[in-house]
């Protein structure tokens, strides 16, 4: 029996794209900081001149799948990380955005064969979002770790 597992220490040659929503940037900026910290501590060059990492900003979470698809389909990246924050309001808008971004990100991964990490927070309040972006823990770090594991795993599984 063969067992396939991703390793966090096999990140050296990975090419990673990160798509970040500007809307709720108080939250998404913190997620990005946590994500970049994780990637850096695991050997990914996160400098502005990096050839391993590209960063793309979109207006909001709804736009994430479109750009994630373009990046994943380019053949340049081993993994794409998506970061956003959708916070419930008084209208059904939350439900529409959350449904479309989650389905869209999943579809990009299935169609492209490139792992796409779903790092879009879906919370009822700003406080909940902030707790997940750094007050209690920073899920951006976890999303970075998931990207490293999936990038490594995909390299180890024969096509």
UniProtKB/Swiss-Prot annotation:
InterPro entries, alphabetized: LS, LS/RS, LS/RS_sf
Annotated EC: 2.5.1.78
Single GO MF annotation: 6,7-dimethyl-8-ribityllumazine synthase activity
Pathway: Cofactor biosynthesis; riboflavin biosynthesis; riboflavin from 2-hydroxy-3-oxobutyl phosphate and 5-amino-6-(D-ribitylamino)uracil: step 1/2
Keyword tags: Riboflavin biosynthesis, Transferase
Active site: 93 (proton donor)
Residue sites binding (2S)-2-hydroxy-3-oxobutyl phosphate per the record: 90-91, 132
GO biological-process terms attached to the record: riboflavin biosynthetic process
Reaction(s) the record says it catalyses: (2S)-2-hydroxy-3-oxobutyl phosphate + 5-amino-6-(D-ribitylamino)uracil = 6,7-dimethyl-8-(1-D-ribityl)lumazine + phosphate + 2 H2O + H(+)
Pfam families named in the record: DMRL_synthase (PF00885)
Cellular component GO terms, alphabetical: cytosol; riboflavin synthase complex
Keyword Cell division: no
Annotated residues for binding of 5-amino-6-(D-ribitylamino)uracil: 23, 61-63, 85-87, 118
Similarity comment: family membership: Belongs to the DMRL synthase family.
HAMAP family: Lumazine_synth
Protein name stated in the entry: 6,7-dimethyl-8-ribityllumazine synthase
Originating organism: Synechococcus sp. (strain RCC307)
């Amino acid at each position: 029996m063969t067992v396939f597992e991703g390793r966090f220490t096999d990140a050296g040659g990975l090419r990673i794209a990160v798509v970040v929503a500007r809307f709720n940037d108080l939250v998404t900026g913190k997620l990005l900081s946590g994500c970049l910290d994780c990637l850096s501590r695991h050997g990914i060059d996160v400098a502005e001149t990096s050839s391993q990492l590209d960063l793309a900003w979109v207006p909001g979470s709804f736009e994430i799948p479109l750009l994630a698809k373009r990046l994943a389909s380019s053949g340049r990246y081993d993994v794409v990380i998506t970061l956003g924050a959708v916070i419930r309001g008084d209208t059904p808008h939350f439900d529409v955005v959350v449904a479309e971004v989650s389905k869209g990100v999943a579809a990009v991964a299935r169609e492209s064969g490139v792992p796409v990490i779903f790092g879009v927070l879906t919370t009822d309040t700003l406080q909940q979002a902030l707790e997940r972006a750094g007050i209690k823990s920073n899920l951006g770090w976890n999303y970075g770790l998931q990207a490293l594991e999936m990038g490594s795993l995909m390299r180890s599984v024969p096509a």
